Amino acid sequence: MTAGPSSDSKLNSSVNLVRSSHSWTEADSAAGFVLRYLSPMRRQLASVLGSTEEADEALKLLLGHLVQAGFGEHKRGRLRDFLVRGIRSCAKARMGELPEADRRELNLDGVTLGSREWISFWRECLLDRAWRALERHEHSHDDEPVFSVLNAATADSSATSDVLAARIREEFGVEIDSSQIEKILPLARALFAQLIADEVVETLESPSKADVKEEIKALGMAQAFSGLTV
């Protein structure tokens, strides 16, 4: 594959923080929507319950409830807050299902709305979803290897364009030179930031630009928007 931005690509440095209009509170299927975020939920439950097996059993309870009742009256605010409450609830419910001799004492003190561990799990999930979206963009735009370029640049921020070009050719099979990297990298950074913003918007209730900015900062992802107009 040979790289080179298409003629209609907008190599700019702007991000529309509220480009996406899809909010979790408007999802047709609560359980279906929440499936996107199984990874951080499973990690948090495994931390609380002591094993991924118990985490999976607790998740079944939570998803079963969402299938039957949807988001219910708690359908407001931030999705991550809704889910952390659900995690606490299903962890307790799972312990209640076990024989008394097999139950462990639950320490839910660290499973709070502002828990550093939960926020870390949540941030990693949103970033992973943005990376996968960037990779899909590359697959559908052969002349815009935005994922390959940004992936290589992120792995070694001090590498020169020539070094990055060689690495991309070797790891991703993309024929690219240093001048093309210098053109594509700004596009890749702006697109990745846009995809992060889109992910954040979908986890908030009818957010304003200020709401999205605040959530990005709270999740520790502001660096991805450095140098960009938002």
What positions do the PLM features span?
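Intrinsic, short, N-terminal disordered tails of RNA polymerase sigma-factor systems
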Residues: M1-V230
